[in-house]
Amino acid sequence: MDFNLSNSQSDIYESAYRFACDVLDQDAQTRISQKILSTELWKKAAAYGFAHGPVSHQFGGSELGALDTALMIEALGKGSRDIGLSFSLCAHLCACVIPLYRFGSSELKDKYLESLVTGKLIAANAATEPDAGSDIYNMQATAQPCEGGYILNGKKIFITNAPIADVFIIYAKTNPDHGFLGVSAFLIEKGTPGLNVGEVIPKDCLSNCPWSEIVFNDIFIPQSQRIGMEGAGGAIFHDSMIWEKGCLSALFVGGLARLLETTLEYAKARQQFGKAIGQFQSVSNRIIDMKLRLEQCRLMLYRACWKHDQGQDAEADIAMSKLLISEYAVQSGLDAIQTFGGAAMDQELGLVRHLLNMIPSRIFSGTNDIQKEIIARKLGLRGTSS
């Protein structure tokens, strides 16, 4: 068992980290304080490779596995303070680009995929509804079959990238009586008649990552814009969530690494009672806990992604890593603030903002309560474990 990264994996990480530091982190504080998402930087980052993932070279992708994609995104999280921009990129890749690549028709891939991979188009994934969050298959949006396609009606909320999106991956019921098998996936373009995108909703966290609600009023969707077979939307969504939980979690592992470095540097430099505060056991113990959390998160995430790349069932591993990383990200954020003391309140330092940005990791891509249900099911505690 070799725990070393290969030379190519190390190169992927180091190159992505340098790009994140040198390009995306520049003026990050200004953008964040002004709640601005720079679409220019977003497109540069996508073209660099952060929107490539497993997509084939044919469509401009990098043909990376889940582990290599996670390494790249971890480097992004460590190198750039602009987590809002990074989150937007990851949502675009994991919930839009990857499902289109894995399940879309040749016609859809030829029409959209290269532009999505290279950053010419921005995508949003629309699944969550007012009464369908954790209970996602209770969605009320419908795509009623009609001659030549479908008529879409409904409402989606908390849709990341919606205000800036050029295309939308939509999930709606094509047969309300069939539950999981009654959901289908579609791709629609901005400006489609009947598509209404709401104003940006202000947030206390990830404040420069735009989201809004979207409403569908009698939208005609040609059959050619359906992703996968009719009724395959549940399986497509489930597959995309495996990628999203793994890769978005990697972003927060990168944040843990950055936070540890910042806190360690401060503990060595800050003097109290005639010595560096890191010399005090209460402080050093907190930093040791932060280090332990980081290494645990890396090991669990890397193993989960490796299993996925090997074609093994990694659902429980992905759920466990997402659960662990999100809980640890919040706790380490609190420990960093405790170590910095009053200095942590400095907005320029960004520690309170960092903590706020960590909290959503316990909610998105399935809440931590849902991750525990997944793990319980895989352990045979909720009926079948298949």
Curated annotation (Swiss-Prot):
InterPro entries: Acyl-CoA_Oxase/DH_mid-dom, Acyl-CoA_Oxase/DH_mid-dom_sf, AcylCo_DH-like_C, AcylCo_DH/oxidase_C, AcylCoA_DH/ox_N, AcylCoA_DH/ox_N_sf, AcylCoA_DH/oxidase_NM_dom_sf. The lineage of its organism: Bacteria, Pseudomonadati, Pseudomonadota, Gammaproteobacteria, Enterobacterales. Involved in the biosynthesis of 4-methoxy-2,2'-bipyrrole-5-carbaldehyde (MBC), one of the terminal products involved in the biosynthesis of the red antibiotic prodigiosin (Pig). Catalyzes the desaturation of the L-prolyl-[PigG] to yield 1H-pyrrole-2-carbonyl-[PigG]. This is L-prolyl-[peptidyl-carrier protein] dehydrogenase. Its cofactor is FAD. PANTHER family: ACYL-COA DEHYDROGENASE, ISOVALERYL-COA DEHYDROGENASE, MITOCHONDRIAL-RELATED. Belongs to the acyl-CoA dehydrogenase family. FAD binds at residues 125-134, 158-160, 270, 281, 338-342, 367-369. It comes from Serratia sp. (strain ATCC 39006) (Prodigiosinella confusarubida). Disruption phenotype: Cells lacking this gene show a white phenotype. Pfam families: Acyl-CoA_dh_1, Acyl-CoA_dh_M, Acyl-CoA_dh_N.
